[in-house]
Amino acid sequence: MTTCQPLPKLWLLSDERNDAVLEQAIARLPRRSAFVYRHYHLDMAKRQARFAALRDLARRHDHTVILAGSPVLARKWLADGVYGPASAMPRDNALLKIVTAHNWPEIVAAERAEADAIMLSPVFPTASHPGGRSLGPVRFRLLARKTAIPVIALGGMTKDTAKRLDWPRWAAIDGLS
């Protein structure tokens, strides 16, 4: 997507476990950050209502608002972009396309989908996948530097791990909540 604004450096992802504090977390983010609404646990009507309220709050703080879901839904719900695997991305560039990736083949798929950014995870051990294997800082950097597309670090990210990773863009669920 062509945009006048640079890609945000800080990204907050919603989840069932941070729902109760999202309003405060969104308000605390620096202006022109990004908010990715997931909330897969809600039925469609409740998901849309919660999205609308959080979208409006995020916009009051000049945040970019991304919907995890179909491009059709992202347009209908007035999101700035769509989040998900490369296979779910729209062919046009009307929405900001944030593609999830965990390895090199998924990064290549993101390039083919003409992603605006790749959310590469998990960098560190994470509550989302307890006991799961993480990339670690070295492997994360090796993968991230192989693509020209901006990469957003996700997974176990907090202010401390972001400082340790020393990467320009990062995202968190619990680490920003």
Question: Where are the regions a protein language model picked out?
Answer:
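Alpha-helix-loop-beta-strand connector modules within alpha/beta enzyme cores
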Residues: 48-64, 89, 93-104, 133-158
